[in-house]
Every structure is written in structure tokens, then in C-alpha cells.
Amino acid sequence: MITNKSKYYFFLILIFINFYLINCQEEYPIDQTGKCEPYIGDSQITKCSTFLPNINSIYVSANSTQKDSMKTLDNYFGLLLAVGSEKCKDSSLTYQTLCSMYLKECESFTDNSTLKTVSIPKRICRKTCNDVTKLCNIESLFNCSQNEPINNLPLCPLNYSIYDLSLVNGDSNYELQCYSPLSNDSIEIPVTNYCPFPLIYINSTDHSADEDRGYMFVSGNSNCVVPNPVPLYTPKQWDRLYDLSNSLSVLSCVGTLFLLFTFNILNKKINRFDRMNSLFNGSVFMMSLSGVIILFAGGPRALIKDGGARISVWQDPLCSATGFIFQLFSIAAILFWVVMSFELWYKIKFMTKKLDLKKYYIPFIIIVSLVFSIIPLATKNYRMIRGNMHCWVHTTKLQNSLFWIPLGIAITIGTIFIGLVMFEIHRIVSANSKGGVLKLEIKSILNVALIYLTFIYLFAFNFYMNGQEGVVYGQIESFYQCTLENDASECTIQGPSIGSLGFFIFCIRIYGVYCFILQGLNYRAYNIWKESIFFNNRFVSYIKNNILNIETSSTGSGGTSTTASATTTTTTKKHNGIDSLNIDSAFSKNNESDDEDDYDPYKKSKNNITLKDIEVSKS
């Protein structure tokens, strides 16, 4: 039961609300430069002619011209048509509100005695503005409670705007009702083939088919596609990432080519480990070559097609070829690495037992690598990795089943054998009471650490990117808002840091450099080159003899001369007939100990020169 006291309080509340609403309607100043003029017409993007309440009377002033308003509307229409929801784009209220907010209806008043005229704009009601921003789900992008920048008064009044018209002999407290249009389904909704920069318009009738061709649409009902490279970074930052990929591809390619040439062509005593290394290094070389092919084709930007509208897919020869090469030899390289780990452990564990499984594992590795590489090709699933710079297997399902899971298993098995190798070395050295265990094991430790840790990072980053795809590409609206307010080239979508993607690229392309450091920078490689035809030919001998003659001349007749060659060191004292000392190299042509095991890359030291190798003769 409502008492008289309740009625009294209710009446007071109504009075308070009414008083609040009246006092919230602030008085707007009259701009003396304001005037009414006809609508200048639609642009390519903005179609307001059918949505304005009065196209013959649009408010303009020195601070707000129709051209300025049309530029702003072009941006908002572009955003609306590009990423607006279906219900937002299909409602006439959206366009009526948007057009009338920036092309305000104009009312003019004239003093008949002085013929002075003033013009004032009719603003959109705040409730209408809130309804539209909620309908279009852009409350975070547009605040209906904001103030106008010039007079710092509400852009959208609650009910009406108050003006002082005493200047033209009118009401000093004139109330101009705000504009609140009603949705009208009979009004034709505009259709345009325009997309705001940097989005690109594609005339698509089948989004699913076009997505298979490499396009990525900003929404299911828009023909605007995301540009490539994806604006995760600025163009300058993308260029730095491209340079990193190109440089590492070349370095890895050159490094592995050096190893193949040194240990399989120049090397006069090739052993089983050289042959095994050649299979592994050859696979890494081909992995790196895929990046070099892209470089010579124009760099990673050559994988971007149609002016940045789409990425390369299996139909593009460069993409399918480099993707197939990278997948094929990545699988082969890791399988050869596992076999190398096993054979190294077996030789150290069972020194007297011979093992020859090449006729089994080489065909097996070739078959597995081909199968895992042909499946993506047959299912049309090679494409450029969006937000990256090479082509590879598409879809998470295929990546996991054909690469990540097999690779993880193989890496783990290889790591176990490397661990056993380190254990055996430690056991043997400890049994002989010799120090320097860490020095002996350092290359094995680096081998497992570098390869395994880079794999872990690649694995984690790949899954992170797959999980972030919806988040990254769901920020087109905020990205576009940035382009409205700033230089578009400096606007980016919030995604993985440039450092994390840069390290991902580093891990993919660095394996050839790893191989060169671990295998190519040692005494054995130096000695192979030293004894090769490049340093043992007439031209080099001529240069060496001339240098020695110069050195001999510089010492004078009473001096001491020392001559060093690849095999013999001779020291001669010319006075008093002192004995001369000849030291034959432990690696001379006829040295019986110079066998295959001396060149075993997994031996930790060469045979030492003993006293029996030293001959003392009379000069």
C-alpha cells in the first residue's frame, strides 16, 4: 500500500530529476561564421544523401566545413563497411546517426529589422548515439559522452541544446530539440567496393575458396582483407626481419657447403663419420638453400601476392617448391642427427664391434622424409606462414602429425644417446684418472644444447602463434582507429614482440652456422686444407719460395735460418758444425699410425709426437 509519505518522496525525486535534466542542458555559444548550405553530395565511400533529414540545409562554419566532415565520415564509413557487424550494417539507424552527427541539420534565424542572420546546428541525441554504438559494438571506440573540442560542451546533448538568440531579437533561452531518427527499413543500405587503408578490397563471392587462395578477410561479411605482411610491426621492422632471414640463410648455406667440400672432396681419408656427417650437413644445406632460393627470387616479399592482398599458397611455384624442400630436408636432417648420435654412442660403448646399418637407415630416412613431405603437397597444404617469411606445412593438425610430434620424438631419442655418449666419455676418463672431462665433452654438450633448445623454442612459439591468431586478427578495429589518429605506417596490431619472432627466424635458419662452428673450426679441417691442392701447387710453392728467399736474405750470412714445411722442420746452425735437428711430422705420408682412426672427428686429440719421431743427424 502506497502511503502519503511515499508519494511525497516520489514527488521529490521527480522534481530532482527534472531539475537535473534542465540544468544539464548547457547553453551553446553561437558561432558568427556559422551558416546553412546545401549538401555537397556523396563521396565514393560516404553515402549520406538518403539518410540526412534535410539535404538542403547543412550546418557549416569556419571551424567545420563539409569537406572536413566528409573526410571523417569516409574513415568511419570505411571502418563500418570493413568490420561492422551484420546487424550494424543492415540498420538504417546506423547511417542516419552517423551522417547527422557530422553533417548536422542547420536552422537559421534572421532579425527582420537588421537583416542579421545566425545559424545553429541540431545535434544527435545522446540516447540515439549510445544505441548505435551498442548495436555496432564500438563503445570502446566512440564515446557518446565526449565534448566538442572547440567549446568543450557535449557532442550529443541529452534532450536539447540551449542558445541565446537575443542577437537577432529572439529568445535568450531558446531550446533546440536534439535529433533522434527512427529506423527506416525502406531506406536502401549503401553497398561499396571500398576498404579503408591499409585494408584491401577483394571482389569475393566465396570467402572459403578465397581464403584457400591466401586471402584473409577481416570478417565473414566483409570483402576487405588484411594486408601482408600483417601489420604486427612497422614496415621498417619487417625489413629488418627479412634481412635477418636472408643473412642467416646465406651464412648457413655457405657454412654447410664448406663442410661438404672440406670433408667429402678435399679430404683424402674419408671415414664412416665423414659420410654420416655429409648426409646430415647435406640436409641442413638444402634447408638453408630454400631460404636462399627465396632471397634470389626477391626475398620474403616475393611470397606476397596481389599487391599485399594475399600470401603465397601451394598453387604458387616458389612457395610449394621451397616449402617442400624445407619440410623434406628438415625431417631428413633430424633423423640423420639421431642416427649419428646412436652410432657415436655405439662406437664408444662397443669399441671392438663393428656396426653397418647404412643399407637400412638410409632408405628408411629417405622414405619417411618423402612421405611426410608429399602428404602436404598432395593435400594442397603448403603456404606462406602468415606473419612470417617462408612457406611451410599449413594447418595445426598437419604440422603436429607430420613435423612437431615426430621431431619431438626424434630429438628426445637423439638427446638420450648424446647423454649416453657424455656418460661413457666421463666414465673412461675418470677410470684413467685424467682431468679435463668438460673440455672433452664440450662439443657433445653444445650439440645437444643448441639443437634441443632451439627446437623447444620453435615448438613453443609455434603453438603460441596458433593460439594467438584469433587475438591478433581480432584487433583490426583498434588498429584502424590508430590510422585515423596517427601516421598509418606507425600503427600496428598488438601481437608477439619483434624480438620473439626474430629469435624464431634465427632458430629456423641458424643450423648451418651451428654445424660450421662445431665441425669446421678445428685442427682437422685446418690440416685438410693445409694438405689440399689449394696450398700444394706450383703457384703456392712459388710464392712460398720467394717469401723464404726474402727471409733468408734478411738474416745475413752469419745468421740463423729456419724453414718450415707441412711435413719437416729443419733448424741449421752454420757455425762450428753444430748438429742439425730434423723432425718428421706425425702425419707424414708413410707414417703407419696415420690411419682412419686418427681422423675420427669424435677423437679428442691427435697422436702425440714421441722421441722416436725425432732424428738427430750431422750436418
From Swiss-Prot:
One of its GO terms (biological process) is cell surface receptor signaling pathway. Disulfide bonds join 36-106, 48-99. Residues 1-24 form the signal peptide. GO terms for molecular function: transmembrane signaling receptor activity. It is a multi-pass membrane protein. The chain crosses the membrane at residues 246-266, 279-299, 322-342, 359-379, 403-423, 445-465, 498-518. Residues 267-278, 343-358, 424-444, 519-619 are cytoplasmic. Keywords: Disulfide bond, Glycoprotein, Membrane, Receptor, Signal, Transmembrane, Transmembrane helix. It is found in: Membrane. Its main location: membrane. GO terms for cellular component: membrane. Residues 25-245, 300-321, 380-402, 466-497 are extracellular. Residues 581-605 are annotated as: Disordered. CDD domains: CRD_FZ. Glycans are attached at residues 4, 63, 112, 143, 159, 184, 203. The keyword Oxidoreductase does not apply. Residues 31-169 form the FZ domain. Belongs to the G-protein coupled receptor Fz/Smo family. This is Frizzled and smoothened-like protein L. It comes from Dictyostelium discoideum.
